[in-house]
Amino acid sequence: MRPILLSGHERALTQVKFNPDGDLIFSVAKDQHICVWFAHNGERLGTYHGHQGAIWTVDCDPTSTIIATGSADNTIKLWEIKTGRCLHTWEFPTAVKRVEFSPDGTRLLGVTEKRMGHLGTIVVLDVKLDVDAEQNPERAMTIVCDESKATVAGWSYLAKYIIAGHEDGSVSQYDAKNGDQLHSVQIHDMGSEIRDLQWSQDRTYFITASKDKTAKLVTARDLEVLKTYPADTPLNSAVITPKKDYVILGGGQAAMDVTTTSARQGKFEARFYHKIFEDEIGRVRGHFGPLNYVAAEPNGKGYASGGEDGYVRVHQFDKGYFDFMYEVERERKNKMEQAQQ
């Protein structure tokens, strides 16, 4: 599995995203640049300029028309993908750590930082997918996190709930229509920040990655923990792969905690676990520094990882990845094939 190395950033990567078709990759980093790449060959399509601080987050709308970015310059910006034109800027009192479009692309949520006397919030903005339309500058809804600040958030199936992961290791569920908190569950160790939250393809369950060295698979409806994937290093990111029942975890010791320079020592690898059986089935090495984000290609053919080393690595899976099966999976497949005959 030879990776394509994308080198377009001078500082650590913060997020890497595929568009819904899987043919474009968007990458953002602490160097104020947003890059867009062709996924199949790693060629750079272009960059988007306008932010004045580290960019923490990016998301692409379902039609691949616009992207949203959130930055340490306290703004969320909308961009036209094709031309690189900035369509709108929303300003906030603190940095924006996460943005995500609703499944239909008409709403955008943003997670703002708790700082300088301001509480952390989750804001919801109405978005028009027409690039020439006037965007609404007002916020549709604001959820204030007065207990523990939200670090990540996303939309569940049909945009019914907003699910947020918090700094204290808890996950909470909000009604997406009025912002009422419906549910809150402490799923990770107390005080272990949730660093990432990524959805299954149908958005009925999600995976979290935490500083407590575990990733957990959780249902969106009642926040029940279905599976736990233990690692030996703090995790920054986790993703559920389409097509095959795997999850990919990324992490590594924080740069300031590393005392040895060996990449093996810092545990800077992408780890593959079986989604159902919770076993680790393989690792992919390559980054020289912690993995800050892992993203799965929507068609299940590969994945991309963004590291503290400033590189994005894009992997296309080999035949062995698709052929690999547990004994029980193979037996089930054979039984189903016999039944069809």
UniProtKB/Swiss-Prot annotation:
InterPro entries: eIF3i (IPR027525), WD40/YVTN_repeat-like_dom_sf (IPR015943), WD40_repeat_CS (IPR019775), WD40_repeat_dom_sf (IPR036322), WD40_rpt (IPR001680). It comes from the Eukaryota. It is found in: Cytoplasm. WD repeats lie at residues 8-49, 50-91, 145-184, 189-228, 286-325. Keywords: Cytoplasm, Initiation factor, Protein biosynthesis, Repeat, WD repeat. PANTHER family: EUKARYOTIC TRANSLATION INITIATION FACTOR 3 SUBUNIT I. Component of the eukaryotic translation initiation factor 3 (eIF-3) complex, which is involved in protein synthesis of a specialized repertoire of mRNAs and, together with other initiation factors, stimulates binding of mRNA and methionyl-tRNAi to the 40S ribosome. The eIF-3 complex specifically targets and initiates translation of a subset of mRNAs involved in cell proliferation. This is Eukaryotic translation initiation factor 3 subunit I. It comes from Pyricularia oryzae (strain 70-15 / ATCC MYA-4617 / FGSC 8958).
